[in-house]
């Protein structure tokens, strides 16, 4: 039976998380909806959020587009460096590395994150 788009995305996300579950690297986890984009840096054990940024904040309230994703990427990089996190694994949650996800990743790299 063919998987739906959502099931296929969740399957890709699960595969990544299973591979990196035992690692000692923190994850930069990205989630996007039609109107917003969210980014979190999660501890290696997966139980604690170390830093977060999204388009729900007052500064980035209007927009879920590529420009807003770039701003979220810069914001998450700034928040990560404030808690002394530099090296992360990029968890795109099964989304294609294209458009808003790519813009967020590029901005986070420019901000000082290494992945």
Swiss-Prot record:
Coiled coil: none annotated. Keywords: Ribonucleoprotein, Ribosomal protein, RNA-binding, rRNA-binding. One of its GO terms (biological process) is translation. GO terms for molecular function: 5S rRNA binding; structural constituent of ribosome. SUPFAM superfamilies: Translational machinery components. One of its GO terms (cellular component) is cytosolic large ribosomal subunit. The keyword Transmembrane helix does not apply. The keyword rRNA-binding applies. NCBIfam families: L18_bact. Part of the 50S ribosomal subunit; part of the 5S rRNA/L5/L18/L25 subcomplex. Contacts the 5S and 23S rRNAs. This is one of the proteins that bind and probably mediate the attachment of the 5S RNA into the large ribosomal subunit, where it forms part of the central protuberance. Belongs to the universal ribosomal protein uL18 family. This is Large ribosomal subunit protein uL18.
